[in-house]
Swiss-Prot record:
Membrane topology: Single-pass membrane protein
Cellular component GO terms held in the UniProt record: plasma membrane
Known role: Part of the high-affinity ATP-driven potassium transport (or Kdp) system, which catalyzes the hydrolysis of ATP coupled with the electrogenic transport of potassium into the cytoplasm. This subunit acts as a catalytic chaperone that increases the ATP-binding affinity of the ATP-hydrolyzing subunit KdpB by the formation of a transient KdpB/KdpC/ATP ternary complex.
Keyword NAD: no
GO molecular function: ATP binding; P-type potassium transmembrane transporter activity
Keyword hit for Plastid: no
Any Pfam family matching the protein: KdpC
Keyword field: ATP-binding, Cell inner membrane, Cell membrane, Ion transport, Membrane, Nucleotide-binding, Potassium, Potassium transport, Transmembrane, Transmembrane helix, Transport
PANTHER family: POTASSIUM-TRANSPORTING ATPASE C CHAIN, POTASSIUM-TRANSPORTING ATPASE KDPC SUBUNIT
Protein name: Potassium-transporting ATPase KdpC subunit
Major subcellular site: membrane
InterPro entries noted in UniProt: KdpC (IPR003820)
Family as reported in the entry's similarity comment: Belongs to the KdpC family.
Length: 201
């Protein structure tokens, strides 16, 4: 019986060593050599301190900063561990809302967001990505239109000329990946960091 089991054990050990040890180590080593920044999380630093990742959105709420898309991520309720509470951009619990288009809770949330955005900028149509959450709840990007929509609010809050803020948006537009994948986009963290360097007029 041991004779019949031996080939199975040999294959098990060989494949475990190959796929569980050799392959992961080779891929990790290759990533560290070829793409060290990406392999380590595309971390963003300011004055030597890590302040975020270019791949994970943050919950900017101040009028002085550009805001990202709505986020449906949650966290455990400290008062009752069987329930959850909203926790926008919680990277430990990436998720969408799973609310269907006819769900009243979704309609109410979108209406509240629309009303707030229209009060902030009554002149321009509200870009769709400012009222729709991404599937992960962690999208670090918004459309150039969503960034430009927020220019008047940010300029007012910072005492900057709208033209200066608009130029910052235009300078931070990322093109389609490889020139054809996806849409032009703006990384909210990168834009807000550029904004912090701008001087009041």
């Amino acid at each position: 019986m041991l004779k019949e089991l031996r080939p199975a054990f040999v294959v098990l050990i060989a494949l475990t060593a190959l796929t569980g040890l050799a392959y992961p180590l080779a891929m990790t080593g290759a990533a560290q050599v070829l793409f060290p920044r990406q392999a380590n999380g595309s971390l963003v630093t300011r004055e030597g301190t890590v302040i975020g990742s270019a791949l994970i959105g943050q919950n900017f709420t101040s009028a002085r900063y550009f805001h990202g898309r709505p986020s449906a991520t949650t966290d455990a309720d400290p008062a009752d561990a069987t329930k959850t509470i909203p926790a926008p951009y919680n990277a430990a619990n990436s998720m969408g809302s799973n609310l269907g288009p006819t769900n009243p809770a979704l309609a109410d949330r979108v209406k509240a967001d629309l009303d707030a955005l229209r009060a902030e900028n009554p002149r321009d149509p509200v870009p769709v990505d400012l009222v729709t959450a991404s599937g992960s709840g962690l999208d670090p990007h918004i459309s150039p239109e969503a960034a430009l929509f927020q220019v008047p609010r940010v300029a007012r809050a910072r005492g900057l000329n709208e033209g200066v803020v608009r130029r910052l948006v235009e300078e931070n537009v990322e093109d389609r990946t490889l020139g054809l994948l996806g849409e032009p986009r703006v990384n909210v963290l990168a834009l807000n960091l550029a904004l912090d360097k701008a001087r009041p007029q």
